[in-house]
Amino acid sequence: MPRPGRNTYSDQKPPYSYISLTAMAIQGSQEKMLPLSEIYKFIMDRFPYYRENTQRWQNSLRHNLSFNDCFIKIPRRPDQPGKGSFWALHPRCGDMFENGSFLRRRKRFKVMKSDHLAPSKASDAAQYLQQQAKLRLSALAASGTHLPPMSTYNLGVSPTSSFKHPFAIENIIAREYKMPGGLAFSTMQPMPAAYPLHNQLTTVGGSIGTGWPHMYSSSMLDSTTPISMANSDYSVSAYGVPIKPICHGAQTLLPAIPVPIKPTAALPALPTHIPAILSNSSPSMSPTSPQTATSQSSPATPSDTLTNPSTALLSVAVH
């Protein structure tokens, strides 16, 4: 089918698609690329039909430019006047039209992802952006203006702040904790183990006496009286709480785990002959003995305590 002449269309709609009209305008230019305004001008000058209802067909033409791979967008150089980018034909779409006729198109041109021109296109765009950045920097240097500081850009660097959260580790460590008796936590002498030595018990006793005067009497914390830990199952922790180990026996290889127990009331100092008396009176202290039941049910009066010292000792042992 021969191509119709230019003067045969007059006011009728030409039989060309928007892709054909755009390709015709680009190939007819000297530089083989045109801005969008020049493409509009070429079509309206060549075909009078498109001089009316310009907004409708121009929207359709822009849609074809953006969604067809046969057209590529070229940014305008800084030295070129005007605004907007240029549009050109893809180098590999030369045979898109059969026999050079814009009336018959072979098939829709599609650029594959593995196209070898894609890396060069990306590199050209990067080079163009670098050139624009250099031009802007030179313009700023010539005008004497300064660039904004780097902190304004979102580079992940936050300025240092002097504000510290009240629950920060520095604030927690810096706090001065007070004990119930008014003794500061920092003045307490920590013990190296759950079982203190003989020379350490006096220091612990002094701290306990100042921390809990209502729980321990002065006679129990007498530093002159030696305290033997050989036959005792109880110990004193660093905070003055009596503890008892879970593991018993001298042959235990595992370290003893201190278990806090409930502190008892203040007791007077016991004489040295009490263990002998308690060992002799062990049958009377049996839970099944009627004497024990009688002593627990009827407390001794102050007169009985003064006249019968063994009753007082028995009540202390039962307690």
Swiss-Prot record:
Keywords: Developmental protein, Differentiation, DNA-binding, Neurogenesis, Nucleus, Transcription, Transcription regulation. GO terms for biological process: anatomical structure morphogenesis; axon target recognition; cell differentiation; cell migration in diencephalon; ectoderm development; floor plate development; hypothalamus cell migration; inferior colliculus development. Residues 13-107 bind DNA. Residues 278-310 are annotated as: Disordered. The keyword Isomerase does not apply. SMART domains: FH (SM00339). GO terms for cellular component: nucleus. In early gastrulae, expressed in the inner layer of the posterior dorsal ectoderm and in non-involuted mesoderm. By the mid-gastrula stage, expressed solely in the posterior ectoderm. At the end of gastrulation, expressed in ectodermal regions fated to become diencephalon, midbrain and hindbrain, and weakly expressed in regions fated to become spinal cord and tailbud. At the neurula stage, expressed in the midbrain and posterior forebrain (diencephalon) but not in the more anterior forebrain (telencephalon). Also expressed posteriorly in rhombomere 5. This is Forkhead box protein B1. It comes from Xenopus laevis.
